[in-house]
């Protein structure tokens, strides 16, 4: 009898589930009177007593939400990685160009001392190139053989190896 009780309980439970299951109640007009029919929960009513299996993906709002969040995350991560791997070039200020006036080919005698023009310290005493070795190193050579006079040649000490440590310490 115990097994009979379990069978009856299972049957009643099955009927309860069948009755409470979410079903779609559909209807359509056949002439002047509506005709009612029932579709399963995963089906949609199609009009004339037929049920069509519904695409449930349109009802899954969380699927679309997660999909859009995934797309936004991938775009953001790609943008971040691209900016880190290929940073934009630094915007540099325009180069500070020092303009100077060239001396005429035939200068008036006594107007300026003979020699090539040179740069000195702006706050300096304006010494002669012979007295200022740094000014000698940065002399401008307007008639250079390179064809471009945009920059002065490198200082002469750039082409020689540095002095030994002992020599530098002894001179101080």
UniProtKB/Swiss-Prot annotation:
Bilayer topology: Single-pass type I membrane protein; Single-pass membrane protein
Subcellular location: Cytoplasmic vesicle membrane; Late endosome membrane; Lysosome membrane
InterPro entries documented for this protein: VOPP1 (IPR026229)
Biased composition (Pro residues): 151-165
Keywords assigned by UniProt, alphabetized: Cytoplasmic vesicle, Endosome, Lysosome, Membrane, Signal, Transcription, Transcription regulation, Transmembrane, Transmembrane helix
Superkingdom of the organism of origin: Eukaryota
Keyword Transmembrane: yes
Ranges facing Cytoplasmic side: 82-172
Signal peptide: 1-22
Topology feature Extracellular, residues: 23-60
Entry keyword Phosphoprotein: no
Location of region: Disordered: 142-172
Predominant cellular place of this UniProt entry's protein: membrane
A GO cellular component annotation in the UniProt record: late endosome membrane
Transmembrane segments: 61-81
Quaternary assembly: Interacts with WWOX (via WW domain).
Similarity section: Belongs to the VOPP1/ECOP family.
Described function: Increases the transcriptional activity of NFKB1 by facilitating its nuclear translocation, DNA-binding and associated apoptotic response, when overexpressed. May sequester WWOX in lysosomal vesicles and thereby regulate WWOX role as tumor suppressor.
Name of the protein this chain belongs to: WW domain binding protein VOPP1
Annotated source species: Bos taurus (Bovine)
Lineage: Eukaryota, Metazoa, Chordata, Craniata, Vertebrata
Gene that produces this protein: VOPP1
């Amino acid at each position: 009898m115990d097994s009979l009780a379990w069978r009856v309980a299972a049957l009643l439970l099955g009927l309860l589930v069948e009755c409470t299951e979410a079903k779609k109640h559909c209807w359509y007009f056949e002439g002047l009177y509506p005709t009612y029919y029932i579709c399963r929960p995963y089906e949609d009513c199609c009009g004339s007593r037929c049920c069509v299996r519904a695409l449930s993906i349109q009802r899954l709002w969380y699927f679309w939400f997660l999909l859009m969040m995934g797309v936004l995350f991938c775009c953001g991560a790609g943008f971040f990685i691209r900016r880190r791997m290929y940073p934009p070039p630094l915007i540099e200020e325009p180069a500070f160009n020092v303009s100077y006036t060239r001396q005429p080919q035939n200068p008036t005698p006594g107007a300026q001392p003979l020699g090539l023009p040179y740069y000195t310290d702006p706050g300096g005493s304006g010494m002669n190139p012979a007295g200022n070795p740094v000014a000698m190193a940065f002399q401008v050579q307007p008639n250079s053989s390179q064809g471009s006079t945009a920059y002065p040649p490198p200082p002469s000490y750039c082409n020689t190896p540095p002095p030994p440590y002992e020599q530098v310490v002894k001179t101080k």
